[in-house]
Amino acid sequence: MSPLLGLRSELQDTCTSLGLMLSVVLLMGLARVVARQQLHRPVAHAFVLEFLATFQLCCCTHELQLLSEQHPAHPTWTLTLVYFFSLVHGLTLVGTSSNPCGVMMQMMLGGMSPETGAVRLLAQLVSALCSRYCTSALWSLGLTQYHVSERSFACKNPIRVDLLKAVITEAVCSFLFHSALLHFQEVRTKLRIHLLAALITFLVYAGGSLTGAVFNPALALSLHFMCFDEAFPQFFIVYWLAPSLGILLMILMFSFFLPWLHNNHTINKKE
């Protein structure tokens, strides 16, 4: 009976965690509806929507990370949840990036003004910190056996490789994800969301054991805030500079190098 009771308790805890994540999604969705109706100033509108989107992403990822730690022997279950919630975020967070790298990409490609970009970046960073403390307050309620507020304030270093490999991992993940984001724009919405969710799941599978495969500076700040405090240079390089480097390389390749290569090839064919 004891193993059965343990299994039942574990199942209840998992369902509670899933319920919390879906509740966050619903609450943020309701808040977005209210914000769209009540906020008419573009700056305030952009700030609030980006804040809510980043809050949703960070809170759900905190809970997903906790679930993955409780089920290390079942990585398929964790990856299934990553895919499912990537779909949920893709469907509900339309028009926001929840990622400073996405804002940087839009600004560098001329799709967003510097002023709007700065507002969105500020919203993401503030939301990342708020989500951390809200998650800690929620965990302190002890809704499940592994919801302990102290967990969110402990530094668990997710970097399991040397600095160079960690930088390459985060840069490559950022490069691949934002390349797909850029080139899937003409794909039908329903298919695009599934493709991006599958890509995110693959990147988490491939890079999760190395750095956590975050490729999002705001999310990294929320997940590993205490680690930033204890080992700032390392975490700044891996989780902020490396994804930004991936964005820069992506833009250089698709906006400059490949067009230049194509033009040279065309000229050579004419000659």
Curated annotation (Swiss-Prot):
One molecular function GO term is: channel activity
| PTM characteristics | Not glycosylated.
- Coiled-coil residues are none
Keyword set for this entry?
Cell membrane, Cytoplasmic vesicle, Disulfide bond, Endoplasmic reticulum, Membrane, Repeat, Transmembrane, Transmembrane helix, Transport
One Pfam family name is MIP
Identify the residue ranges that face the Cytoplasmic compartment according to the record. Answer: 1-14, 63-74, 185-194, 256-271
Tell me, in a sentence or two, what this protein's role is: Channel protein that facilitates the transport of water, glycerol and hydrogen peroxide across membrane of cell or organelles guaranteeing intracellular homeostasis in several organes like liver, kidney and brain. In situation of stress, participates in endoplasmic reticulum (ER) homeostasis by regulating redox homeostasis through the transport of hydrogen peroxide across the endoplasmic reticulum membrane thereby regulating the oxidative stress through the NADPH oxidase 2 pathway.
Query: What is the protein named?
Result: Aquaporin-11
- Recorded source organism is Homo sapiens (Human)
Taxonomy-wise, where does this protein's organism fall, top ranks first?
A: Eukaryota, Metazoa, Chordata, Craniata, Vertebrata
